[in-house]
Amino acid sequence: RGDGARRLAGLAAVAAAAEIPLIAVGDVLYHAPERRALQDVVTCIREHLTLDNAGRRLEANAECHLKSADEMARLFRAAPQAIAETQHFLDRCRFSLDELSYEYPDEIRAGFATPQDALVAFAEEGARRRYPHGVPAKVRHALDHEYALIGDLGYAPYFLTVHDIVRFARAQGILCQGRGSAANSAVCYCLGVTEVDPERADLLFERFVSAERREPPDIDVDFEHERREEVIQYIYRRYGRERAGLAATVICYRGRSAIREVGKVFGLSEDAIGALAGTLWGWSAEAISNEHAHRVGFDPADPRLARVLALARELIGFPRHLSQHVGGFVITRGRLDELVPIENAAMEERTVIEWDKDDLDTLRILKIDVLGLGMLSCLRRSLDLLQKYYPACFASPVEEEIDQTERAGVDWEGGETPIQKLNEKKQTPPTLDAFGVLPSPPLRGGREKQSIAPPEWEEEDRAQLPSPRERSEWRGGVGGGEALQPSGYVDRCVTTNHASREEQEQKLRLDLSVIPPEEPAVYRMLSRADSVGVFQVESRAQMTMLPRLRPRTFYDLVIEVAIVRPGPIQGDMVHPYLRRRQGLEQVHFPSPSPAHGPPDELRQVLGKTLGVPLFQEQAMRIAIVAAGFAPSEADQLRRAMATFRRVGTIKYFRAKLIDGMAARGYPRDFAERCFNQIEGFGEYGFPESHAASFALLVYASAWIKCRYPDVFAAALLNSQPMGFYAPAQIVRDAQEHGIEVCAVDINFSDWD
């Protein structure tokens, strides 16, 4: 400032009088002088002003940048002791974020010597429930491998915390399912956190937990969206707001928001701002170009417009505001405020942590994502309606014997359920279904001529539907009347040891495990694109894909979920996969030179997807197997894929991957095509485990729609708002499936 010398002399006098040292610092607002213009823009955005009327709220010059040590010594040459004191002060500032010591909650290991002992005990108990006739060798090997890695990394308390939350939800009859990379874990499956059977899937545990990364695992659990709040309240009751809080998320400027805010600062009209921003998308600064402005009718040579475009490009990626994460909970052993910065949430008695998930990952702080999913609410309603109006659909021939077992007071929490005991008594070895549990009995009866099924259904489809005599009367929405008890099937985790018998009886509700697996009629329905309301495959794009892909197995649904995404489409993966699936194109797997590996190394990675990389795990395996990446480097590639739109660092792996594949004998053009496909994932690529978790819900919702379209329509209507379709479209679809939908009637209708 012009009066800097006078101010310095005055401050020196005050310091001498108070006998405290003088410290020299700069008023740093940006790192380099050329950023002064962007600082002015940010100031105007904060103050809701334009540059023309901001006045003295803006800095007078560009001196608020980070100056070098030599420049600071020159500016404070009249007070060298202030420079020396600044250095002395900095030398004493020894705090590092590495000193923050996060400790997992430990109270859930009561009764066990260590958290690892508790984890193994709970997982082994779950394995016995999942595999009542013996744990398969493949699963046993996976469990032992995961136990060892979890123990070495000290993550057992994290798994126990998630297990405790999921166990609470199931005890309350709340449908829940883990997804994401956690579905790679056999331990999570046995704990009941995820539903992807490791015996049937070839999943990569290191995608979830890796010794090279040494980062805490991140488990996402979906709960019924209408009852997620019950789970959140349980977390706060158990740990208190002093130990539990929601993580933050940093909202950054994208192309549209940057153009809008900078345009307002420069006084552009709303029409001009709308025209410039309306056709922008994503994070790319390159999209805000002179060519773009010219296409929408502006003159890029206009000085004001050129300045707007340049500053908008600089603003992209800057933090805009701090928001609350959709469901990421941080839970600690000690107090939150001793570990992380916190603030009050909008809701009373709740806390928000002022760090986002990337900050938490860097510091290895536990985060559990407690998410809401509308389809789980719909499926819960569907199962309740089936239990109430179609009890025979899941009835077992041994129903009476099960009831006698119940009356005998069998402790279902002690291990085996009554249905398992009776199956063992009859020595009928059951086949495990896609959900890893005992399949439900076959549906009884036939279907008479007045079938609710569409006329194009095949006879074998009709034969498995319940007969009209077995169906209860149902009119428009959820009907009244007393609910019937389930026929011997129970949620394997619905009770706690201290629950009363009455509470246990209230919790006898059907869960997704009773849905029969791999019914051809369900796949035929999906192949006709008859998927209105079905989870994940109800969009127009999915309906277009279904008749082309024609799913026939559960893994086909995994492919269906993953392939209709911007990543595979942009990476030119969809059409090659379809052509190969239909036999129109030969599947060819290039081989490395004999000195560098077996000829079928890529077939082992891409065989299931016909040579097309559709999943993040496959991209990681290609990098490791074909390009010589270390596992840690492959994980960095995954992270670059996940943040491609925002950060754009995937380009740094191009040369390493292409050169690595070429050095091992792969054709360079093939290596370039592989990289382009991987780059096409952007942040839209699915991990296979995530797609498998969603495919389970696809099949469950499709089965209910196929067999009981009235139940499915009622559940969808009572779960609104959710999905792609309005209630009128859901009603019309039900009518097209032969369902009579009546008007609201005070004698029959009920509320939910």
Predicted features, each with a name:
Residues A12, A16, D91, R170, ...:
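Anion (oxyanion) recognition and catalysis
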Residues A37-A113, D117:
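Active-site or pore-adjacent capping/gating segments
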Residues G126, E399-E401, V410-E413, R444-E448, ...:
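Glycine-biased, low-complexity coil/linker segments
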Residues D403, D411, N423, D433, ...:
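Intrinsic-disorder-associated, low-complexity terminal segments enriched in Asp/Asn/His/Tyr and depleted
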Residues R407, L422, Q427, Q450-S451, ...:
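Cationic, low-complexity basic patches in intrinsically disordered or flexible, solvent-exposed regions
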Residues A62-E63, S101, R109-F394, G446, ...:
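Noncatalytic, beta-rich nucleic-acid-contacting surfaces in large DNA/RNA-processing enzymes
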Residues R1-P33, R74-R77, S96, A121, ...:
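Domain-core and long-helix interface of multi-subunit machines
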